[in-house]
Amino acid sequence: MLRMRVRPPSAIPVFLIFVLLPFVLTSKPITPHYGPGHITSDWCGFGDSRSDCGNQHTPKSLDIPQELCPKFSSRTGSSMFISMHWNNDSDFNAFGYSNCGVEKVFYEGVNFSPYRNYTCYQEGSFGWVSNKVGFYSKLYSMASTSRCIKLINLDPPTNFTNYRNGTCTGNGGTAKMPDNPQLVIFNSVVKVSTQFVLPSSSDGFSCTKHLVPFCYIDGGCFEMSGVCYPFGYYYQSPSFYHAFYTNGTAGLHRYICDYLEMKPGVYNATTFGKFLIYPTKSYCMDTMNYTVPVQAVQSIWSENRQSDDAIGQACKSPYCIFYNKTKPYLAPNGADENHGDEEVRQMMQGLLVNSSCVSPQGSTPLALYSSEMIYTPNYGSCPQYYKLFETSSDENVDVTSSAYFVATWVLLVLVIILIFILISFCLSSY
């Protein structure tokens, strides 16, 4: 009679199963640090008093770690929007913003908000919020393919005669007309054309593109001395044309701006009649051969001042990552109620170290990937985050770090292989 010898299963595979399985089942994700971050040291920031170490109330006035001030181009009371449109005077604190970095963090904008209650004509302060959204949307988009940004002055035209500069009618006639673009009103209706030059470089900075404002006043013709004059003009070059014209019945006049990306070159600014604008400043930018989304942090006042959501509206995927505050602006340990917000200070801590990933969920120093792999095309969609599921919004509800994700699945595969080995071993014993 044949006897079947059954060998007992090896204790080693069973031991491995019981040792590895708990790791598979209990591995946990690493929570990213919510706020802006950077992958390399080649980064820069743009700000206001909350990142200006020249402020007399530093460090209590800061929302960033004090040691990061050299990384930021900042001025108390200013913003990139204010500096685009106005010169430095008693009404507006303009600043020559200039900075370079592959990665960019923007934390400014609050100094021009509905709290200022500015209106030039009848657009109201919220009409200027729309202009602000348009400006930052174009700025962020252009900056995502640029390393350097510099505000530059343009040479004024010299061939004008018999004209006066335009003025605002809002705020009882006390509102200061934007200096950029400059509006001029001629004494007579004549077709006038003047040239302006967008340079290809400025003080050692390469300018392969310029952010230029084109502003106009809508609402039909303008009544002057019993005559209603059409309102219109255009910018033109052999490869560029942008215009506005209206000759309808005079109505509600609003000051509206388009923000244009223009290449270096010589352009004509030409009037259709009595009014003309020409640019006096531009944001000069170079061009990178890849795209790195910029990062913008919500810039608001405390609850005692009226703010807007222009930064959030302007900062959109794929060219910008927006970090929204979850609480009102609160500064119990700051210089005043509008400087030293605790939440933003915590958000900005992520800028103190290089991270391996920057995403809408935040940044983390843990990753299995190099910076070269992240810049193109994964900056903003981090390789070390595994998307568990998508939602109808732009952000993922949950993410898991790849270190744990990869380890979990490797261990799971090993356990499955060991189970098959054990089964095969048992079957072969019969």
UniProtKB/Swiss-Prot annotation:
The keyword Repressor does not apply. Residues 134-274 are annotated as: Receptor binding. The chain crosses the membrane at residues 405-425. One of its GO terms (cellular component) is host cell plasma membrane. It is found in: Virion membrane; Host cell membrane. The active site is at S49 (nucleophile), D336 (charge relay system), H339 (charge relay system). Residues 275-390 are annotated as: Esterase domain second part. Glycans are attached at N88, N117, N159, N165, N247, N268, N289, N324, N354. Residues 426-430 are intravirion. Residues 1-27 form the signal peptide. Its EC number is 3.1.1.53. Residues 16-133 are annotated as: Esterase domain first part. It catalyses: N-acetyl-9-O-acetylneuraminate + H2O = N-acetylneuraminate + acetate + H(+); N-acetyl-4-O-acetylneuraminate + H2O = N-acetylneuraminate + acetate + H(+). Disulfide bonds join C53-C69, C120-C168, C207-C284, C215-C257, C315-C320, C357-C382. It comes from the Viruses. It is a single-pass type I membrane protein. N-glycosylated. One of its GO terms (molecular function) is host cell surface receptor binding. Its main location: virion. One of its GO terms (biological process) is fusion of virus membrane with host plasma membrane. Structural protein that makes short spikes at the surface of the virus. Contains receptor binding and receptor-destroying activities. Mediates de-O-acetylation of N-acetyl-9-O-acetylneuraminic acid, which is probably the receptor determinant recognized by the virus on the surface of erythrocytes and susceptible cells. This receptor-destroying activity is important for virus release as it probably helps preventing self-aggregation and ensures the efficient spread of the progeny virus from cell to cell. Belongs to the influenza type C/coronaviruses hemagglutinin-esterase family. This is Hemagglutinin-esterase.
